[in-house]
């Protein structure tokens, strides 16, 4: 660095010349000392002013100290540069202190002084100082300056006083497009979209043409509300005024319409984009998926180059939310192959997909991906793994995850309790509940749902009653519908149907379809047809098109051989376009998933499957099996009913599993056949599976709509209570 020439002369022009050479704080200090020693008093202020201005770009703090040492009131032309520099610094409070120093020594502000001070006030939300400054501006009549007025408007909004900002806006004599945009943008930032849109309408009525920035702000705000009236109005304005749309505006428009589900309009603006960024492509994928148009979402996704983690996660989540877990896992595999590393959010979606699929081998693979990517220490991920393994039938793996967790919260304990309950391990669930309390973890509402669920599915009536009472007595937790539902289910499964009805009638809140449905199902199982009809009628009052209630009524009439009533209900269902959900069963074989419907003959091995079914039925009949046709709701011959029962989807899946095990001599690592069904297992299939587990010496695990059934040696983990 070249040092400035030594200071030898006291001439004014020489000192000023030296100022221009100063490049470091050390040089400034040398010159400062020289000025104090040599400059006479009446010229000192001028030299100090110049020194402070020159040094502000080198060391703002030192420059401020020099400025503060000036005894005479400075002129605004001198201190305004200070205000500008201070307002751009990382310490906006210094600007406010400097302003107060100016006021203290009698300095006069001009219109250029206010903006940097207002900027600093806005940064720290110093409302009191801002209001004081507003009074000063009013006194010196600078409020007529539109830049100053806009600055005060922005300051009040930044301090959370949006109404004060609007008052300033309303009192302005002249409003340009910047002023309108500032007020609209502030309304949008506060989430006051209605006010922002009204102001947008006022702006148009005032013949001020909004620019792209205003349109971006209003479009983005309207997109967050999903208000279709606003969306249509914006579209009409753009078309009527032939507005030129840049990339930012088109991005906002696509995002708005995609978020509102108006995919045709979103696609119109999407096609106008010459350059499509990743953000807008992801918005289109998300919009299509929310509308159920997964094929369109996949097309946009496939066309998107250089996809980031957010884009991949959006596509995975789309398939998960639309109940296509296999497709979600396929996309995840593609993401991993492309080199994108998953995060917690993406893994949540993948874990959810795997849980829905119910395939244990897939669950283990997902767990290995979590380990490889260093996410195993995440508490939320471990909690999700507990749920995933539980739904995939891997109770031992569930326990292993829980016990190895470095830390647990109430969600961890509740998830593990629910997993045990789901698998019929009520005693273990109760033991874990006791251990949870011993470790001083306060149970919450979800915990009690899991414990009561376990009591219900294992017939532990007295334990369930005590736990339900403890919610209010010990933990001051008000029972909700879910807890009352568990109690209704508890009494219903134990054939205490009147007690179940009393729970419903004594509830402090109105019962819903789920609770009446629980009673209705219990009545069907225990043959209480009159009470079952009563429950079904309550359901139909709440939900006239409820398929379960209509099917139950049809079932009851079928058992009573009231075929005309059965036909009447079927006619009502057809008129209302109500259909019983079809049973679907899934089994995984050698990494590939196979699905079956009732009487399904689409599978390429159908002939072999039905031949295997005939063989199995013949063997089971020797063990005493007689098909239970009570679940067949049609007036047909008994032999035809038997065929309908034997062709249930889970039986076809089981025969496929048995057949391929024997053919390939390949079994699950534990010799287990695993099946997932979307509906409740019927009584006949339940007996069928128990007998197969004994005759063929196989362990079979079935996940139905409500729980797991582990069939082994002719017994089921549900103890025939499901």
Curated annotation (Swiss-Prot):
Region (Type DYW motif): 622-722
PPR repeats: 75-109, 110-140, 145-175, 176-210, 211-245, 246-276, 277-307, 308-342, 343-377, 378-408, 409-443, 444-479, 480-514
Region (Type E(+) motif), start-end ranges: 591-621
The keyword Repeat is assigned to this record: yes
Gene3D superfamilies registered for this protein in UniProt: Tetratricopeptide repeat domain
Region described as Type E motif: spans on this chain: 515-590
Sample GO molecular function, one term: zinc ion binding
Record-given protein name: Pentatricopeptide repeat-containing protein At4g14820
Organism of derivation: Arabidopsis thaliana (Mouse-ear cress)
